[in-house]
Amino acid sequence: MLDDFFTRALIGGVGVALVAGPIGCFIIWRRLAYFGDTLSHSALLGIALALLLEINITLTVFLISVLVSFLLLLLQRRATLSSDALLGILAHSTLALGLVVLAFLTWVRVDLMGFLFGDILAVTAYDLATIWGGGIIALAVLSFIWNSLFAITVNYDLATAEGIKPEIINMIFTVIVAAVIAVSMKLVGVLLITALLIMPAATARRFSTSPEWMAVIAAVVGSISVLMGLNGSLEWDTPAGPSIVVAALLCFIVSLLPFPNLIKMKTRGFTRIANLPVKVKENDEAS
């Protein structure tokens, strides 16, 4: 019989993994790993401001992440620095500002390690409602913009010529990423959120034969990583958040073995066979 805290942690972790997987695919396709790091680092500033103003932490982290992402878009248009340089400036500036603000909160007892590396075992029923409610909304919006976002990812100019508005789609995607970071912050902490976005998607890439399958497999791999990580944390008394990331790393290492390519070849073979029956049956009837 599982303890209540473990069950809540598992339900919350799976909820985050189901959303982080598909979003992580676009982060990999668009090479936005450092962008994810920037938003996750800015989450600490959101936490500090929420504690200072005594308001909801999740909502504040979400708003700060959106603000930082829009600030990045603005700086990219006006500044002469490269995107990597701007991301580095924003990531480390917001992280440093967050730590400085927390240092001034002498009247508040702050669990800094919990914010940095997660405290999934302290997930409450309210957290579960936030994770699953926000996750469902994020997936619904992502499915709505999937084709447009994928078209922009593949060929920006062609997508623009077809009437798609890349700026609007990119802003919507940025808001989705910010929402995922806000709800998953308690799972693995602000320093490891990007790992939960990238590793399952990178693992799924080795097994998938289409973008949609990659998103599905990434969600499954993320869920498996959560289950493995929590079990390992319970068995060896290790931090839950880092344990989940280590489990995701093990899944990625397994994906580097040769058999994922064999699975992809077999899947393609089954797909080709499935496309043949009409002609084969006609030949059989004629004979």
Regions found by a protein language model. Give the residues of each.
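Membrane-interfacial amphipathic/re-entrant helices at transmembrane-helix boundaries
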Residues: 1-18
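Transmembrane helix-bundle core of multi-pass membrane transporters
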Residues: 4-8, 79, 87-147, 175
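Small-residue-rich segments of transmembrane alpha-helices in multi-pass membrane proteins
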Residues: 42-52, 90-102, 122, 166-177, ...
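Helix-loop-helix "hairpin" substructures at the membrane interface of multi-pass membrane proteins
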Residues: 128-197
